[in-house]
Swiss-Prot record:
Belongs to the NAD(P)-dependent epimerase/dehydratase family. dTDP-glucose dehydratase subfamily. Substrate binds at residue 132. The active site is at 157 (proton acceptor). Keywords: Lyase, NAD. It comes from Methanocaldococcus jannaschii (strain ATCC 43067 / DSM 2661 / JAL-1 / JCM 10045 / NBRC 100440). This is Uncharacterized protein MJ1055. The keyword Cytoplasm does not apply. It comes from the Archaea. InterPro entries: Epimerase_deHydtase, NAD(P)-bd_dom_sf. GO terms for molecular function: lyase activity.
Length: 326
């Protein structure tokens, strides 16, 4: 590994946690600085659990800060040795962006600007940052390719992620910073986000509560298991590109009703389903074209939806005593 001092934003988040843990498990001479504001968008108990696991590593340094606060960011990091930034921190969630749009501008716009500007001022040569499949909006052409138009987002969250890509190009063009954007497709797995459908489904099924099934179940998602996403991020870190955007998905869309059937099977309990109309800001289908990622990164997802959900459900059952209280 070329980089020895990596800053991971959102390190107590779902993807940030798994990436940080993988890096420290596999590279003894590598140090991770993790930053996170540990906000309460979802129950912070889960973020604390992830963070406590990471704090057990000697080569992990955690700093609680809000990277949308420029002065706080600089004050805490100006003296740290950093040679790569993996920017995963963000205000997540499509539906929540309809309720609290200001949170997205603050974190995803101002926060990302601050991270990019920090890289410029402190001579950090490369930033790998999280984008999202939501930038494809309501595009009807499938699968979604990096060359497709992405100028018609249908949620504020999506618009902020597209804005991040545009800012990244500016910082590459003006200052020569290497910028690699990764469009994640519905990431799932252990220690995932409680606001995500699969997590809510598992929790409510075990509690005997109804699960909400949008668009009457007529939806498909390109669910991507966390270990495949971490593999894609690692490849983006190691490969030497000046500016690129890549899809990181599974390229095998799963029908929502089959997805629910699998969770029922692995939890050994039937769901009580409440069928609802399509939600504002949602899309019918996501489907990643991985030809570019495979060609340039060598990225090939390995975990099937059956295997991934089995792992998640087993983990959930083993930890249900505290997970059901979230």
């Amino acid at each position: 590994m070329k980089y020895k001092n990596i800053l991971v934003t959102g390190s107590a988040g779902f993807i940030g946690f798994h990436l940080s843990k993988y890096l420290m498990d596999n590279y003894e001479d590598l140090k991770v600085i993790g930053i996170d504001n540990l906000n309460n968008y979802y129950n912070p108990v889960l973020k604390e659990k992830r963070n406590e696991i990471l704090k057990n590593y000697e080569n992990y340094t955690f700093i609680k800060l809000d990277f949308s606060d420029w002065d706080d960011l600089v004050e805490n990091l100006k003296d740290k040795e950093i040679d790569l930034i993996v920017h995963l921190g963000a205000q997540a969630g499509v539906r929540y962006s309809l309720q609290n749009p200001w949170a997205y501008i603050k974190s995803n716009e101002m926060g990302t600007l601050n991270i990019f500007e920090f890289a410029r001022r402190f001579d950090i040569e490369k930033v790998v940052y999280a984008s999202s499949s939501s930038v494809y909006g309501g595009n009807r052409k499938i699968p979604f390719s990096e060359d497709d138009r992405v100028d018609k987002p249908i949620s504020l969250y999506a618009s902020t992620k597209r804005s991040n890509e545009l800012m990244a190009h500016v910082y590459h063009h003006l200052y020569g910073i290497k910028m690699i954007g990764l469009r994640f497709f519905t990431v799932y797995g252990e220690y995932g986000r409680p606001d995500m459908a699969y997590f809510k489904f598992a929790k409510n099924i075990l509690l005997g509560k109804e699960i909400e099934v949008y668009n009457y179940g007529n939806m498909e998602r390109d669910f991507t298991y966390i270990s495949d996403v971490v593999d894609g991020i690692l490849r983006a870190i190691k490969k030497d590109f000046d500016y690129e955007i890549f899809n990181l998905g599974n390229s095998k869309p799963v029908k929502l009703m089959y997805f629910i059937e699998l969770i029922e099977k692995y939890l050994n309990k039937k769901a009580k389903k409440k069928f609802l109309p399509m939600q504002d800001g949602d899309v019918l289908r996501t489907y990643a074209d991985l030809s570019k990622s495979e060609k340039l990164l060598g990225y090939k997802p390995k975990v099937t939806i059956e295997e991934g959900l089995k792992r998640f459900c087993n983990w959930f059952l083993e930890n249900k005593d505290w997970l059901l209280r979230l």
